[in-house]
Amino acid sequence: QTGWLSTMYISRPKREKHSRLLRLLKMSRLTKISVLAICVACSSCAPRVATSFWKIGTEADSVRPGYTVIHAEGKTRHCYPITKWEDSADVDTYHQLHHHGVAVESELMAYRLYFDKKQTIDVYCKRTPQLELAQSYWYPNDSLLAEGYGDDILRVSGTVGVGSVKYWNGTKQVHIDAGKRCQYIADQTHHQATIGVTVNDWQVEGKSEEMAVQYTLFAGHRDMRCDVYTTHPIEGLCTGVQTIPAKGGSDTVTIILPNGILLASWGTDWPVNDTVKYGKETVGLGVFIPKAYAGMPVHDKQNNLCLLKEEKNTAHFYLTVCGATKENHPIATNATEWYDYLLKWAKKLK
């Protein structure tokens, strides 16, 4: 049984760490089920990333696997988990999905992708490093907040948020107004997870376009990688960071590096409309586009952006976030520290 355990559930670098457990198992008569139970209980083998994707239904859906009742936003929702959902543009899917789209989390950050033409990335920051969405469902109640759970930290409104893929019309960023949209969980292991969105019948630059955008989050990381795929080159694709607050924010920078372009912002704003229960959050946003995919930097009143330059109809970039007031031990407490951190982060990427 120990050979099965070490081969299937403990990677080679971890075997030395688990040698005491393996010696114990060799002397035992444990079944495979018992061995699996021990391994699951081991913290280093437990999942360190997770996804969250819920369809809002009715009590009749209680027969579905994973069905649960979620109390959020002042409502009681009968929900069941999904891995994929597709709808046409005339369906208000945004309000038919709990937390309005698919989400992914590591111990440090969680990100959700809105299921509408915005396709904006929104941010949930962890106060304590841990997986939380299986308990908070993005909207932690008072008792969870008292236990040290994180929360949403960014009001994205109609902006690019951080690392969303938008279209530059020559004067400002606009949303992806496609005929059909599909969100999905592409992949999930203990140490990484990928979520994505595809659009079809997107009328842009004189043609009907299809596009897929995937975000991958790794265990122990606050940053994500974004991969973009199109059927034909699209000159106006862009990404970037919003100003904070979305209206009136000004602390943004664009830095041309030898290996690409770094976009960043820093600021303070209320993350939600309830300004009585929730306080303002100070947040840092960053996006890095490798040189091969970095086009011309552009901006409008609410967004610091860069055009994406595709190679063989693909491009990729990276995004990251700091919750200066939310995290117990933030990596930056002011704009200068944040920009210094981003410079070191970006230099390692390609």
Predicted feature residues:
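Acidic (Asp/Glu-rich), glycine- and aromatic
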Residues: 211, 222-255
